[in-house]
Amino acid sequence: MNLVMLILALWAPVAGSMPELSLTLFDEPPPLVETEPLPPLPDVSEYRVEYSEARCVLRSGGRLEALWTLRGNLSVPTPTPRVYYQTLEGYADRVPTPVEDISESLVAKRYWLRDYRVPQRTKLVLFYFSPCHQCQTYYVECEPRCLVPWVPLWSSLEDIERLLFEDRRLMAYYALTIKSAQYTLMMVAVIQVFWGLYVKGWLHRHFPWMFSDQW
């Protein structure tokens, strides 16, 4: 539309009979709106990590317990630690922020993550800082292993499934055998209690000859 008006405006002085047109080639820009500036990112250029290690286990019921240990130049304000885990389906980053141990040390830091339920098919747990300087230095991962006692009386079927996922088949079959024996003994105990409280009394009342001393 602006191009058509420009052609008419240039042609009007030549034609002589064309009425004058008020031409506006460009619209006025909207007024600037002042916005609050974003808070500056922490200066982590002097932050250095010389050693980083993570250990993680899965307690009964798929509860993750992880420890992240760092050593280095930690005298500057620490960036926010982040955790996410990887499953067969992909990544998930909705994990609570690890809790830092209360310590005055400027050389070593430890972060804990306790009692967070993760899927049974979790492959890796990954730790990093956000934001960070030289992120590859801080990136560390660990493979969670299911922690099952030698007498797995309180282990669940989910724990046995996790053992199979970790390819620890011998431990999984052992735990399954112990759980089967446990459930069998529990059923025997229930049957004995039911027999003593109800069945035996009913037989005494209706068939007393079965308990006669003359036999």
From Swiss-Prot:
Residues 47-146 form the Ig-like H-type domain. Disulfide bonds join 56-142. It holds the Pfam family CMV_US. It comes from the Viruses. Glycans are attached at residue 73. The keyword Membrane applies. One of its GO terms (cellular component) is host cell endoplasmic reticulum membrane. The keyword DNA-binding does not apply. Residues 18-182 are lumenal. Its main location: host cell. Participates in the inhibition of the host immune response. Redirects newly synthesized major histocompatibility complex (MHC) class I heavy chains via the SEC61 translocon to the cytosol where they undergo proteasome-dependent destruction. In consequence, infected cells are masked for immune recognition by cytotoxic T-lymphocytes. This is Membrane glycoprotein US11. It comes from Human cytomegalovirus (strain Merlin) (HHV-5). The lineage of its organism: Viruses, Duplodnaviria, Heunggongvirae, Peploviricota, Herviviricetes. The gene is US11.
